[in-house]
């Protein structure tokens, strides 16, 4: 049953990828519906999965519905085209059997291939006729169907008389009533652009007769083949015919169509009112179809109207696709007659029927779908937008406050000159010197000022002095990254926690390699930088920091360069001081924390106790309603590791980590660790943060410079370049850089060398002045307080990070009487110079994971120096602490031995007074210190001169015995006095 339940559960992150929505939106939806989930890596059942798909699949439903509407429209158009084709074939058969009227003689015109002349038939025929002739320049008729069948026809008898193309109708045959009399051919001036072919009722008989008379005077019309010679004829007089406005009983239409090529002469159309298949006039069925489609479009648009959509909507909220209006006389296409001739309308005032624009409808459907998607997750998106807006406002306010504060802060290096300070504050050097004179300091323009003087002078000018290092003062300003160069980069994850809580074991399982075996004592003593490929071919860079208290600087440095912190806490232990310190480092750096409760496979594991202690430390996990993700794991068994990786990737997706991957930008990174190799020289572990670091690039790092000679990954495999978030080992430093220094690629070796030399000059000057002052202060302190005991040491280690950790740990071991004085520290093996320096300063040499060379070893034996070697930092700190405790003065304690009562006093010649005593308690020794008490008041403190029983000298007297004694250099003893015997005991002190 348990296996079946597992098969029916789904991970939230997988569902979000399947639906192509944000994991946070899915998480918010589950919580809004009463679901209790901790993070996007949590599992949900089949029922909740159905709810999620029902909510977030609205977009798919709307897209499917839009596709159905589009398919239905295409199907209807296809069916309409098929019906039109069949109707047109039937009409052709009827047209061949129609009555043909006598030919009307017309003067020769400019005629091309097809000539269609339609004239009015006699009243008995009750048919409409239209005379059309195609000009030499072919024009496109507005009569065309969806299948792109085009016919070219136009009436052009003379320049002044122009007729318009026939109107568009549905392919249906309409007959007119018999009461209709002879219609006419209506002509309009050339400037008129509206359709001119329009039938009139029987009241217009006079105009019709006149038109027939004019046509009878024109000569005979003959069909000219395609390539015949055109004959010019005189222009005919224009006979304008104005329509008589009267409401017709039935909508009359003029229909034009092509005459077959095998028919010659003039063709007269019969009485049938046939429909052209390319006519677009509104019929009942087409109107119903358009109305149905319009209602569907309006239903979608009315719910979610956008400002852009409102501008495009016309009348009934359908976009009218207007055709270009051009004069018919210039050979271009005239506007199409989109509506039928129905009702009483004024010429030039006809309103075109709207045509649906499919592109606009598709855009509106997409807008509707987007709106429905927003409404589905409106709560989470609105909350997210509100939070982002508030964050931007806070950032803007903080930036404004920062700019205001910067106006009153001057950033200056220690021991700056008046000239440099004047440039920073925007005043003259003369004013600075005058202020110094007013403060009682006589300085020159290039003289160096100490820290107190700089602070006082800055306050005099209304500034607050902020002291920076020489590296910050000469930092290279990076260019602003282009948005197009910023791409998603792998996250940098730092594993932090207390010692022996399983940080390296966790990384060991992830990397599938035994890292702990390579560390002395089973604890991590370096920052290890590794790049790991996880599920989905995604990369994560891990930094493994030491957990011992001596490596505080390393943990702080790891928190400053990381994106996510994994806080490892042992379930069978508790939240330790280094755990609290790691939490503070992460919070100070603004880095998100993912809690990993390790060792849950042990019997004594108690994860709930760990969560309680974490909440007391300010880390409230998601299971308890907090914001920090938590995962119970076992680094040895691999339990929960996959879920932990999923939470890391989810956190990285939320933060949208990006880096500059441009090929042209100068690379930069941070020094994680440095060491001195005997064969390769200085090797530094660098975490690239921007651009690509390549072999041959000149660079500057701190006070040193160099050129990249080789790049190696964590497995010592040579590579050619390293991108953002990639750790790499770099060879090519001229000197050993410090951990935490920024490595910046320069344009040339010259620029790198100049910047490094400038920093070195400032550093040497600062160290010289600082060391001189320390010596003077040391002399003054020794005069005031007496000589302080100091343990002088020289530290040599394998890496710069280990040196810093050792130095920090040793400097913490001190009190008012003793302390550690580090004379020299460096990376690499112990040399003869180190031995000579130790002999001159009476110091001991501490070698951490390094050994002396042969000459140094012989010299140390000759000088009888104490050289100690260690590989675990515990042992170094313990031995140094014992040595300092041995230098402390011991504590003195008084221990009572016994007491005697003087009961009789004897006077002995040449000796003085001797007391006869009785031992009350304890034991009194001959060499014991004694004090004489009289009435409870001490009157003597010294030693015994003699101690006898009877006439014999004894060494001790026990309680209950009598004895005689005399005090050294004291003779005033009386009966009743009490003699107390005691001794002073020395006790070693602890730091």
From Swiss-Prot:
GO terms for cellular component: cytoplasm. Residues 522-526 are annotated as: G2. Residues 326-340 have a biased composition (Low complexity). Residues 138-160, 201-210 have a biased composition (Polar residues). Residues 598-601 are annotated as: G4. PANTHER family: TR-TYPE G DOMAIN-CONTAINING PROTEIN (PTHR43381:SF5), TRANSLATION INITIATION FACTOR IF-2-RELATED (PTHR43381). This is Translation initiation factor IF-2. The lineage of its organism: Bacteria, Pseudomonadati, Chlorobiota, Chlorobiia, Chlorobiales. The gene is infB.
């Amino acid at each position: 049953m348990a296996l079946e339940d597992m098969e029916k559960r789904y991970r939230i992150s997988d569902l979000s990828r399947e639906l192509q929505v944000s994991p946070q939106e899915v998480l918010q939806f589950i919580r809004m519906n009463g679901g209790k989930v901790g993070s996007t890596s949590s599992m949900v059942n089949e029922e909740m999965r159905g709810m999620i798909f029902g909510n977030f699949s609205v977009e798919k439903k709307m897209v499917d519905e839009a596709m159905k509407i589009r398919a239905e429209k295409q199907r209807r158009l296809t069916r309409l085209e098929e019906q039109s084709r069949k109707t047109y074939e039937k009409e052709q058969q009827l047209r061949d059997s129609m009555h043909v009227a006598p030919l009307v003689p017309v003067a020769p015109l400019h005629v091309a291939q097809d000539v269609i002349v339609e004239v009015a038939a006699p009243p008995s025929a009750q048919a409409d006729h239209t005379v059309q002739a195609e000009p030499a320049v072919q024009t496109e008729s507005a009569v065309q169907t969806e299948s792109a069948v085009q016919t070219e026809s136009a009436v052009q008898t003379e320049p002044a008389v122009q007729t318009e193309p026939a109107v568009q109708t549905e392919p249906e045959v309409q007959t007119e009533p018999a009461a209709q009399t002879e219609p006419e051919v209506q002509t309009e001036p050339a400037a008129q652009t509206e359709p001119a072919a329009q039938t009139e009722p029987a009241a217009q008989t006079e105009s019709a007769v006149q038109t027939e008379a004019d046509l009878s005077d024109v000569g005979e019309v003959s069909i000219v083949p395609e390539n015949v010679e055109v004959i010019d004829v005189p222009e005919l007089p224009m006979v304008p015919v104005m329509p008589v406005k009267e409401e017709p009983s039935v909508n009359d239409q003029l229909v034009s169509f092509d005459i077959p090529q095998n028919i010659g002469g003039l063709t007269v159309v019969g009485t049938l009112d046939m429909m052209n298949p390319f006519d677009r006039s509104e019929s009942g069925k087409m109107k119903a179809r358009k109305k149905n489609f319009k209602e569907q479009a309006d239903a979608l648009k009315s719910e979610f109207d956008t400002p852009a959509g409102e501008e495009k909507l016309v009348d009934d909220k359908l976009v009218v696709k207007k055709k270009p209006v051009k004069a018919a006389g210039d050979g271009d296409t005239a506007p199409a007659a989109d509506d039928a001739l129905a009702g009483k309308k004024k010429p030039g005032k006809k309103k075109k029927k709207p045509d649906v624009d499919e592109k606009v409808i598709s855009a509106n459907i997409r807008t509707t779908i987007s709106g429905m998607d927003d409404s589905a997750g409106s709560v989470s998106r609105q909350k997210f937008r509100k939070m982002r807006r508030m964050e931007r406002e806070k950032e803007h306010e903080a930036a404004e406050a920062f700019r205001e504060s910067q106006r009153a802060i001057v950033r200056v290096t220690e021991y700056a000159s008046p000239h440099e300070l004047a440039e920073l504050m925007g005043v003259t050097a003369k004013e600075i010197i005058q202020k110094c004179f007013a403060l009682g300091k006589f300085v020159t323009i290039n003289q160096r000022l100490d820290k107190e003087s700089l602070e006082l002078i800055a306050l005099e000018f209304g500034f607050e002095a902020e002291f920076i290092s020489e590296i910050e003062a000469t930092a290279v300003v990076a260019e602003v990254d282009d948005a197009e160069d910023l791409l998603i980069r792998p996250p940098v994850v730092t594993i932090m926690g207390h010692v022996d809580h399983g940080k390296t074991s966790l990384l060991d399982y992830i990397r599938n390699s035994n890292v702990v075996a390579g560390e002395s004592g089973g604890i991590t003593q370096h920052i290890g930088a590794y790049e790991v490929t996880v599920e989905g071919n995604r990369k994560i860079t891990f930094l493994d920091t030491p957990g011992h208290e001596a490596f505080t600087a390393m943990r702080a440095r790891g928190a400053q360069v990381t994106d996510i912190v994994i806080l490892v806490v042992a379930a069978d232990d508790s939240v330790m001081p280094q755990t609290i310190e790691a939490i503070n480092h992460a919070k100070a750096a603004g880095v998100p924390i993912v809690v990993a409760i390790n060792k849950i496979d042990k019997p004594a594991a108690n994860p709930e106790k760990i969560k309680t202690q974490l909440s007391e430390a300010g880390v409230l996990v998601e299971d308890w309603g907090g914001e920090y993700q938590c995962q119970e794991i076992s680094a040895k068994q691999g339990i929960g590791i996959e879920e932990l990786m999923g939470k890391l990737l989810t956190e990285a997706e939320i933060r949208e980590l990006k880096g500059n991957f441009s090929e042209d930008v100068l690379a930069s990174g941070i020094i994680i660790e440095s060491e001195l190799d005997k064969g390769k020289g200085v090797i530094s572990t660098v975490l690239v943060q921007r651009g690509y670091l390549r072999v041959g690039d000149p660079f500057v790092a701190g006070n040193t410079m160099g050129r990249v000679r080789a790049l190696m990954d964590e497995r010592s495999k040579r590579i050619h370049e390293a991108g953002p978030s990639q750790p790499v080992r770099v060879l090519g430093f001229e000197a050993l850089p410090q951990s935490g220094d920024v490595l910046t690629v320069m344009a040339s070796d010259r620029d790198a060398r100049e910047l490094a030399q400038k920093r070195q000059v400032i550093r040497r000057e600062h160290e010289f002045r600082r060391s001189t002052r320390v010596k003077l202060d040391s002399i003054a302190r020794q005069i005031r307080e007496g000589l302080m005991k100091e343990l002088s040491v020289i530290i040599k280690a394998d890496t710069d990070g280990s040196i810093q950790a050792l130095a920090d740990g040793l400097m913490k071991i001190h009190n008012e009487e003793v302390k550690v004085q580090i004379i020299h520290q460096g990376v690499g093996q112990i040399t003869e110079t180190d031995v000579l320096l130790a002999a001159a300063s009476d110091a001991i040499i501490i070698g951490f994971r390094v050994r002396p060379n042969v000459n140094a070893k012989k010299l140390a034996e000759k000088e009888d120096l104490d050289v100690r070697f260690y590989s675990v930092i515990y042992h170094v700190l313990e031995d140094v602490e014992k040595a300092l405790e041995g230098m402390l003065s011991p504590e003195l304690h008084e221990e009572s031995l016994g007491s005697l009562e003087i009961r009789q006093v004897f006077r002995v010649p040449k000796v003085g007074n001797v007391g006869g005593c009785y031992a009350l308690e304890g034991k009194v020794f001959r060499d014991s210190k004694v004090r004489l008490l009289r009435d409870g008041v001490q009157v003597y403190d010294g030693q015994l001169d003699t101690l006898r029983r009877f006439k014999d000298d004894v060494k001790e007297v026990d309680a209950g015995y009598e004895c005689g004694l005399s005090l050294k250099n004291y003779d005033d003893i009386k009966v009743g006095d009490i003699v107390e015997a005691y001794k002073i005991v020395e006790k070693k002190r602890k730091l």
